[in-house]
Regions:
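N-terminal transition regions in large eukaryotic proteins
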Residues: 1-128, 318-393
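Long, repeat-rich segments with strong aromatic
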Residues: 207-261, 364-371
């Protein structure tokens, strides 16, 4: 099943403006409702065009994350950077983030924002010692900083870090790798041929790591596309980024299948995200896949796959194979085989037209079976473990 379809025709400017004005009015209505209609805001964030402007995002993103505007963190003090174990790594990452700032921004303004970016990250980590910094985290934080400013960004990022991004901020990458495994599960459900090709290429899922842990902020050049995806992700389940990653791979099905079936070729192709993707179409399809294959089903399939790979679950198959190799089992089977062969031999030899060559062939077959039986018995004695079978019923 392919997800690639022609992109829809462009909307006429006057029609687009009408839809935009109507959507802005609906967002304002949801914001002015008492209580605020968060469900409607989520629908607006997901639907075509997302939240439209940064001005609207400043009002809606806090509602989507349940952040209260009158309870923002205080401004950080100078002591924040002193004796902070993450400071040097954060500093290096932020210094390398030049391309995440708008082109043409004056150096002085950009450098000031970079200092604010460092403070946001360190403050969130200081207030939440259970969180661990990872490279790529700053790509998410800078998006919030550029849209909503330092103080509100600190509150939003803190809430995001303790919820949506929590698995990425563990001491190990175990949970991150577990989420990445969902990528292949989704692809397998939609397009088994593509899944099998990628498995044969042994490409794995590492190509999608930066997509996932930066919410695509690190790999998309156009900031408009980044904030559009953030609208979508903030309004959805925390696993939605992995569904979006899956639809990108599925959309590029033909490119992947045209590749050499080896890890290097497929990894190189998928690591380079085209900048002209039909984002609205892919967002819609990611939502469809989420409904069709919800996280609960993916978790069940992932658990089933893990169980099939564990020693305990494969024990019965191994036990059966070993039992069939045990000397007593082998001998009983070979005796039955020999008796059957002898019966067939007797039948053939009693036929008046049976010639000498047939008799010799049958005798040779009987001898060969006997030799095979001895070889199997010997191998069983050498390696078959002596299981306490009653331990694993």
């Amino acid at each position: 099943m392919s997800l690639r379809r022609p992109s829809p025709d462009g909307i006429a400017p006057h029609e687009y403006n009408f839809k935009k004005k109507r959507k802005v009015a609906e967002i304002c209505q949801a914001l002015n409702t008492d209580p605020i209609d968060v469900a409607a805001l989520r629908r607006m964030a997901i639907s075509e065009g997302g939240l439209l402007t940064d001005e609207i995002r400043c009002k809606v993103w806090p509602k989507l994350l349940n952040v209260k505007m009158d309870d923002l963190p205080p401004a950080p003090g100078q002591e924040l950077r002193e004796d902070n174990e993450d400071y040097q790594q954060v500093l290096l990452d932020v210094r390398r983030s030049l391309r995440r700032f708008p082109p043409g921004m004056p150096d002085e303004q950009r450098e000031g924002l970079q200092e604010e970016l460092i403070d946001i990250i360190l403050q969130v980590l200081q207030r939440n010692p259970q969180l661990h910094y990872y490279q790529g985290y700053h790509d998410i934080v800078v998006t919030f900083l550029l849209v909503v400013g330092e103080r509100l960004a600190t509150a939003l990022v803190e809430k995001l870090s303790t919820h949506h991004l929590r698995d990425f901020m563990d001491p190990t990458m175990d949970n991150t790798k577990h989420i990445l495994n969902y990528l292949m599960l989704i692809i397998d459900q939609v397009n088994p041929d593509l899944h099998d090709f990628m498995q044969s290429a042994e490409v794995g899922t590492i190509f999608a790591l930066s997509w996932l842990i930066t919410w695509f902020g690190h790999v998309l050049a156009d900031f408009r596309h980044v904030v559009r995806l953030y609208d979508f992700f903030l309004a959805c389940h925390p696993l939605m980024p992995i569904y979006f990653a899956a639809v990108i791979v599925l959309y590029r099905e033909q490119e992947v299948l045209d590749c050499e079936c080896d890890m290097a070729s497929v990894h190189h192709l998928l690591s380079q995200i085209p900048q002209d993707l039909p984002y609205e179409t892919l967002i819609s399809r990611a939502g469809d896949l989420f409904v069709q294959f919800p996280p609960s089903e993916l978790a069940r399939k992932a658990a089933q796959q893990r169980a099939e790979r564990t020693a305990a679950s494969t024990f019965k198959d191994f036990e059966l194979a070993s039992a069939q190799q045990r000397p007593d089992t082998v001998l009983r089977q070979r005796i039955r085989d020999r008796l059957r062969v002898e019966e067939r031999t007797k039948s053939i030899l009693t036929k008046p037209r049976t010639n000498r060559f047939v008799k010799l062939a049958v005798m040779g077959l009987t001898v060969a079976l006997g030799a095979a039986a001895l070889a199997v018995v010997k191998s069983a004695l050498e390696w078959a473990p002596k299981f306490e079978l009653q331990i694993f019923p």
